[in-house]
Amino acid sequence: NVVQTPMFLNSRDEFKNYLGKSKKPFMATFYKEVRKKSGILMGADGNPIGGKWSFDEDNRNKLPKDISIPKFPKINETNHTKKLKPVIEKLFKDHPGSTNDFWLATDYNDVVKLLDFFIKEKSNLFGDYEDAVNQKNNILFHSALSPYMNLGLITPEFIIKKILEFHKKHKIRMNSL
């Protein structure tokens, strides 16, 4: 028995229903159905805002060499993090990475801080360079919020709400929404 959770926008039953009525299921078709049902990025006339369902073709730009990529804000180290660092260094000393550049938020307030940073500093260029790769920066204009959703620190609904509120005032480009 699966319990519905706010960590997903759709329930298993909703997805099963979609699969049951689709001869050829595609994620693009499912997303279209979800947008219609939820009203996310939909106009009052029932059509998608921006005139089309997908802007994927606009999300494949090459990253310019001279582009400035905003650095994530520093997350304050908690007492819990301070206690865990020596344990991590001992148990995982042969693994890549360092606790010296620990950037993960460990509480809700810091996750919201990272969301706000993404929305204000990265979201407008996210779409343009969504598929770009760079050896010096593996996050680029992505939000890096997935771990926090997976840990239950923030919900997809809250993220969508905050981004759309910002978009009303500051107009994020459609391929970034």
Question: How would you describe each model-predicted region?
Answer:
Residues 1-104:
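Beta-rich, aromatic/charged-enriched effector core domains that present basic-aromatic interfaces
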Residues 59-177:
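Catalytic cores of enzymes that engage adenine nucleotides and/or redox cofactors via long glycine-rich
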